[in-house]
Every structure is written in C-alpha cells, then in structure tokens.
Amino acid sequence: MRSLTPLLALLVGALALPLTPLGASAATGAAADEGTYIVQLRPITREAPQSLAAAQTAQYGGHLVGVYEHAFKGYTAQLTAEAAERLKKNPNVLSVEPDAEVHTFAQTVPTGIRRIFGPSNPNLDIDGVDDVRINTDVAVVDTGVDYTHPDLNVVARTNCQTGVCVNNSGTDDNGHGSHVAGTIGAIDNNIGVVGVAPGARIHAVKVLNSAGSGTLSAIAAGLDWVVARAATIEVINLSLGCSGCSSSAISSAITNATNAGVVVVVAAGNSHANTSSFFPANHADVVTVSALTDNDGLAGGAGGSTLSCRSETDQDDTSAFYSNYGSTVEITAPGTCIYSTWRNGGYNTISGTSMASPHVAGAAGVLTAGTRKPTTRAGALAVRSTLISTGNFNWTDDSGDGVKEPLLDVHDATKY
C-alpha cells in the first residue's frame, strides 16, 4: 500500500498540481518565456557537474540556479521551453523536467506515542525525568524546524527553497516541520511532549515556504544536501508530495539515498485516494505511511468516534477518513489529532498522514541508532522490513482497498 505531495497537516484536499514550469519570476533576470527545469546528467558522464552545468546553460542560453553532485548528478536552470527540448537530446543528459509546486500534507505522552507502545519499551526510557536521548540523526525535509525550541534537539539546518541550500539559514514560518520533528524526537524532559526517538538529532532541511508550498527543485536540492551527509544521517522524513506528478531526478535521489543506507519515510497523502498516482509515496524504495485515527492512545477500538480536535467523527482504531490507501502503502501509524511541537516554541494539535509518517521515521531512527546505522541499500531495506514485520494488526482497516497494512508497534525491546 504506498504514494508524494507535502501533505498539509490541516487535511487539505488532493494536491493535484500541474507539472508545468514555474514562471520567470522565480529567477531575477530570466526571460519572459523561461521556466525552471531540473536537469539530470548521466551517471557515467566524466566531466564534473559544476563545469558541465555551466557549459550547458551557456550553450543553450539559460541561467544556472543550482548544481547537485550527491543525491544525483545534475542542476537546476532557467531555460526556454525550446532550449529545454534541445537539451534533452544532449548525450550527457538523462532527463530534463519542468519544476513544479508541491505542498505539505497537512510534557504529556501524546496518544500516538502511546498507541504504538512507546512507553512499553524500556530502551526508549520515556519517563519525563532523565532526558535519555536516542543516538540517531533524522533529516526533516519540510517547512523548516524551530531550531530554538526547548523540546527539540536541532543540530543542523539549511534553507534550500531557491534550489541552492544555504546552511545555518531558514526557520519554520509555518509550523508543519516543527510538528513533524517533535513526533520524531521531542526530548524526554519535564516539559511539552516526547517523541518516538526521544532527543534524536534533527537536521532541518527547509524546502517549503510559510504556506507549506515549495518546488521539486527545492526538494532535489534538499535531498542532495542530505545524501552528502549520509555518513551521519540515518533517516529522511518527507511529509510532502504531489498528485499526478513525478520527477526522474528526485526518484534517483531517493534511490541513491537508499543505496547509501538512509531510510526514506514518506506520508501517503490526505486525499482518500489510491497512492499509485502520488509522488514520492509511490516510489519503490520508500516506506509509505497511511494514517490511523486513534482517540485514546489505547488498542481495542473503545475510544469512541468523536475527534478531540475536529468537527468530523471517525471511529477509534480505524483508517483515518482522509488517508490515502493502496498497494504501495506498507504501514500505518496514528495521524489524527496529534499533539506535538510547533513554531515559536509552542505546541499544537493537527491531523494528516504528515503526522503519521514521523511516527515511523522516529521508529526507523531507533532501529538505526548508534552502531546499527546501515551503510548499504540492503541495510536500509532491512530496516523497512523490520518496521513492517514488527507491526500489529489490532485495528480496523475500513479503507476499502482490500489490503491491511500493519500498525507501527515499537514495544519489542529486542528489536527497538
């Protein structure tokens, strides 16, 4: 069951955005008929991406925006549509694709942490007292993260919104990324909330703006930044995506991240639709996460049908009414009325598969902590298999897709 779009945590509808070049206003000095394109170079090309990108943009009359050398070899450039078509025929070029917009899928121990049995695992030591931290690094590719939040352990940040990452820049002016980060790794102290992997080191990669929107080129730059640090980072969370779009460059970036041993976790989307047309949730290498409605933090379905944070009703321990579904979804996790950290040092309760995905990303962080960090594709995919095999089926799948995915379960101290 698997599907991409930033999933707006506030349950916005389908993120079906046309895959058309962004307007010329995206770059100063661009011609009126220019758009932004992502160019993927062939891996066997011997010339350095920087020099080849400069030469090609000059040859085809474009304006170079950013160069990528880690997640994939390529660059982003301002080009006319005619130049982009000619560039596709260059023997050193694998793909040329128009940039497109994407969006977010919109201390107490939160119900989601309780529902996946986090407090039952002594290795996680969730007690609100001694601030034991999980030795793992997770990249949150999102709206940024509140790096001064007292409940978060943010160790690095970069702003990639322009297609070029600027280190030590960018904060969360939306709230979505900070919420995701808290579910992954809020510190187990005596304030606020606690995450699945308490105290996990968060690498904040800002690719989305204050409205929760961004571009494929920003995501490409962000993933390139992460893969360059694959020796340190164990997990990527992508609570974002788009419906009906795709990107060869970003697909390659995800594959190369996996090949480097990084586990990539993606939200399924909030359109109550099949994930087969949602990118990157339909990518073969990612862990795609649907959302469960849990009203009481307990198994058994006895929590009623009234949602604490919404006007809708959704029966306890069932598929969330908004969640995408399908054969590309591997696992489900709590996503409705999740309480977590927020921008400006605050806390907030929101819903979406964006909130389900970081539960799984946090669990992946626990599985890869310390000396268990994978360094190969096989290692990253083994983590995905463990996440799935340790899940339980003590919930009701009423999505109608006929395939019941396991519910994340981290209670087993011999595995987590």
Regions found by a protein language model. Give the residues of each.
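Hydrolase catalytic cores
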Residues: 32, 181-185, 190, 201-209, ...
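C-terminal subdomain of the subtilisin-like protease fold in secreted/lumenal serine endopeptidases
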Residues: 65-69, 112, 194-197, 204, ...
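Structural recognition of the beta-strand scaffold that forms the well-ordered cores
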Residues: 37-39, 76, 95-97, 137-141, ...
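Extracellular S/T/G-rich loop segment that most often corresponds to the catalytic His/Ser-adjacent loop
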Residues: 141-142, 262, 278-369
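Active-site core segment of subtilase-fold serine proteases
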Residues: 107-201, 218-221, 228-235, 239, ...
